[in-house]
Amino acid sequence: EIFPFNVPEGKNDPAFLQNLQQEALNYINQQQVPNLEKHKAEELKVAAKERAAYNAGYY
């Protein structure tokens, strides 16, 4: 079945679904980055150089 139809409860609640989707994306991102802390440090290093282009709310 396709998301969100395999969600037992809350499938008619947009906020619930959005939160679930965000949790799933966060999980996937963590699987793709072997060392999350190192990755964040690199992001911050880039952010320091490009302050204007960086959205602090991303992490």
Swiss-Prot record:
<protein>
    <recommendedName>
        <fullName>Cuticle protein 16 isoform D</fullName>
    </recommendedName>
</protein>
<dbReference type="GO" id="GO:0042302">
    <property type="term" value="F:structural constituent of cuticle"/>
</dbReference>
<keyword id="KW-0193">Cuticle</keyword>
